A protein has these predicted regions:
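Structural signal for well-ordered, non-membrane alpha-helices
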Residues: 13-21, 50-54, 58, 110-121, ...
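Long, hydrophobic N-terminal alpha-helical segment
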Residues: 1, 9-46
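Short, helix-capping/interhelical loops that line the mouth of catalytic, cofactor-
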Residues: 1-4, 55-105, 167
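Hydrophobic packing residues in well-ordered alpha-helices of helical domains and bundles
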Residues: 6-9, 39, 102-106, 145-148
Length: 167
């Protein structure tokens, strides 16, 4: 994994931890509207998403190399005016969470992803490997990593909006 990809993951996760660290239970579980997730649910969704991304990346690493993987415009995920429907496997639980439990889940999923990336052979080029994404189709693995960071940024903005409305 190159330093840019690592930096993206590190930066987005640090921002997420920073915006949720001081939340009390009321703020953590407040739902601005019935169809809007709470901050706890957003964090659970990020955990579930990272697990799915890690599995896709791990499987993609084992595949053969490809020469011409088309780079997709993954930046549309940062547009908060565009709504996406999450697949069931990354839809959060409605069960209440403790902040410490969410932090543990987020640390666990990030550790698992980093372990997959660190364990791969040093001669593997992530831009020559791919995996199928449900929205974007075939994505190079370096774009999967970038998308994970962009997705997290999208939800950080959502969390900040919820926090602002509560203060």
């Amino acid at each position: 994994m190159n330093y840019i990809e690592y930096d993206l993951l590190f930066e987005s996760r640090n921002q997420l931890i920073e915006v949720i660290t001081e939340l009390d239970e009321k703020m953590l579980h407040h739902r601005p509207a019935p169809e809007v997730w709470s901050i706890a649910q957003i964090c659970h969704h990020l955990y579930l998403t990272e697990q799915v991304f890690t599995e896709a990346i791990a499987n993609g690493i084992r595949e053969r190399d490809f020469n011409n993987i088309i780079q997709k415009n993954i930046y549309l995920v940062t547009n908060r005016t565009k709504r996406f429907v999450s697949p069931d496997n990354v839809s959060p639980s409605s069960t209440p969470f403790q902040l410490s439990g969410l932090m543990d889940l987020l640390a666990e999923s990030r550790d698992r992803l980093l372990q997959v990336l660190y364990d791969m052979d040093s001669d593997i080029l992530l831009n020559r490997k791919k995996a199928k994404h449900p929205l974007f189709g075939d994505l190079s693995l370096d774009q999967w990593i970038e998308l994970l960071s962009l997705h997290e940024q999208r939800h950080i903005k959502q969390i900040q909006e919820i926090k602002s409305a509560l203060i």
